[in-house]
Structure formats: C-alpha cells, structure tokens
Amino acid sequence: NLLNKRFYDYEDDIKTNPTTRKLDDHVLVVDGFNTFIRAFSVNPSLNEDGSHVGGLVGFLKSIRYTINKFKPTRCVIVFDGKNSSKSRQKVFPEYKAGCKVRSRLNRNVDWSGGPHDEVVSMKLQISRLVEYLECLPITILSLDNLEADDVISYICTSTLKGSKCTIMSSDKDFYQLVNDKIQLYSPTKKITYDRDLIRKEFGVYPQNVLTCRIVDGDKSDGIPGVRGIGVKTLVKEFPILTEDEHFDAKELLVSANKKTTRISEMLVKNEYIIKRNYILMQLHDPDIKNQTKLKIVDAVNSLVPKLVKYQLQTLFVKDKLWGQIPNFDNWLTEFNIL
C-alpha cells in the first residue's frame, strides 16, 4: 500500500540523510502529562476567583524556564493519547493500575469534595492548557493508543536522528535513550543527564539501564521486578553491566544460565518477569504502526505554528492570571526565540 511504501522510503532516507534543518539543530521534546502532573501536584496557585490554576500556570512557567535555560531551536510537546496504556495493559493488566495524582503542596486548595473535585479540576486545567499551547510557536502531539514515552522515543531516535534533543521529563524510563545526541532534563531536580551523569548516579551507562530496570521493576508504573534483586545486587553479580558496552536482557539470561549462584538462579527462575518487563519498559523500538509513524513525521516536519498573541491575552484575561504572571508581555518574549 502507498502509505507503507511512503514510510519505508522515509526510513531509508533518514538512515542515509539525517535531518539537517537548522530548525532542528536543538529540539526540546517535552513529556506533557508528566510535566503537567508535577505542576498540578505541587503548585498551589489560585487565580483571582480562588480557583486552583497550579497545573496550568506551573506548566507554562516551567516550559518558559526550560526554553530560557536551553535556548532550543524549536519545542515539541507530546501528551499521552486516548487509551494510551491499553497495549501494555494487554501484556500486564496491572500496568499503571494504581497511579494516582498526589497533591503534596496544595494546602491552599479546598479539595473538600474529595478526589472527584481534584480530577475535575485537573481535566479542566489540562484542556485549557492545550488552548494556551496552541497559541504558542510549539508543536503539540497526542496520538490515540500511544503513550508519550513511545512517541518521544520515535521522535528523538528516528524522526530527528542527527539532531540534538533535550527530553524534559522526571521519568527515569528515558535514561535508556540518552546518548551523545540525546540528553534528559529533570525539571524536579533541575539536572541535565548525559551519559556520564547517568553512569555516576545509576551505576551503569544508558545502554544498560533497561537491563537493570527490567529486573528491578518500576514502582511508579506498578511493574514488579524480580523480588530480592535490586540494581546494586545485579551489578555486583554481573560487573559487565558497568562497562561502556551493551549487555542486554538476552545476554543477561544466557550468562545467568551458566552460573550457579543464588542470584543467577533467581533470574533464570523468573525469566518470564524479565521478558515481560522488557516488553513493558523498552523504548528503543516502540510499538507504533507505520501509518502512525508517518503522522509523527508529518507533524514534526511541518512548519512551526506562529505566536498568536491576541488569543493568548484573551485567555489570560478570562482566566484572571495576572496575579500569577504579573508582566505577561515580558513573559511572552522568551518564546520569540522559537
């Protein structure tokens, strides 16, 4: 079919001709929902009417701060699509089943109506946020049945192959993607992770992070690992993981089968957990249909939207945000670099 032919032609082209557009010299790729939830959880800001606007304001301020910090040539924000967890829940039904929003610092906010009020506020704010973002010179992506992680991975490793990419997220899943062209900025820690910093903090280089994490599991997504084996224990058993070469899950299991230690025997016994977690946690080869990949390519390669200042000002006045962003015109100037 023509769509598949177009996709394979594109794949061949990107392998031999990585992107050279000046626009794509340094792309800031934002994990949208991760950034929003962090802002919603910790930012207690209220507008003039006393409504909680922490998610909206916190997100906008965070994006502006990060653009000012890195001076990217463009910005792409990716949100989880509808039914985004569905494919992974087919593999493991408990995936993200217990994920909840934690309003750690929202002491000024009256959630007396219980979780329902909080969820309603969150939905209203994220919907409004998209209206703001559509007025900024930013590319926004959200695709049904896909998590932002998978789309971000495809953008950074394929669509923008050859470009410098800064991923903005507090999600450790992205450690595995870091290389000479891709870095990870954690807005919670205000730290930018390159290969060496991940080696220093996590104990292994990025290419072996996935091997460690599929054994350790991921509590934030409700993915259990092999009980009793953490990263430090695994690295002690297999020191090769600390070296600057790829040691994947398949090699781990082959090596474990050759040893008679308790740790290796536990790994062999729980092989199914390791293989399942690999499917759930790997981002290098995201499960995206060819037609959907073309949608991502078209969105990233399209012209960057123009700044629509008058529409932004209208939203700003309607939402009564002058107490949170006092000098709106000055605040907007940072987006002019995009």
Can you annotate each of these PLM segments?
Residues 84, 304-314:
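Multi-pass alpha-helical transmembrane bundle typical of ion/small-solute transporters
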Residues 192-220:
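A short, charged helix-loop
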Residues 1-13, 317, 326-330, 337:
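Non-catalytic terminal extensions that flank enzyme cores
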